[in-house]
Amino acid sequence: MLIKKGNPKNISGVTDLIREDIRLFLSNPETETVSYQGYVNTLSGMAARENVDLSFPTDEAPDTKVCYGEQIHHREAPQAIIDGRADVAVVYYHLALRYTRIFPALFDMIPLGGAIDHPQPFPENVISLSHAGLIGDGGQWGSCFLDFLSSESVSIIYSHHGLLRA
């Protein structure tokens, strides 16, 4: 979860999302269905784990507690927090890690399991894995590129940026 630097609302986890003073940013359920569904499934799973009724992200009626992105959530989420339209955004770990690295004076993050520098996601977290393959024979450089993507060097780079490889 991405939050404003200093955590002015004292958010510590999913249980705080039911507080009346907390506004949540989520990706758009109609235009970014994959990320939206992943985030909602993660929130639902984490809420069940914590025994919290967190029905508002999936309620039919618009809710003032939820600020939805309009186009590209990975650009809009940090902006919504800085603009004061949201207090917390559920985003992929690698995105929150990037925001805290490029804007360390603006953002903090709350991992949903483990620590920021050593995440241990709870089983309820939806985790996306990256896959690569060739179409046909991959052309002149396809197999070399696939070998490169499968190398230890690239795994280290992925890991540094909070990404997992299948």
Explain the meaning of each model-derived region.
Residues 1-3:
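Glycine/small-residue-rich loop that forms an oxyanion/phosphate-binding "nest" at active or ligand-binding sites
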Residues 5-166:
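Exported/periplasmic ABC-transporter solute-binding proteins
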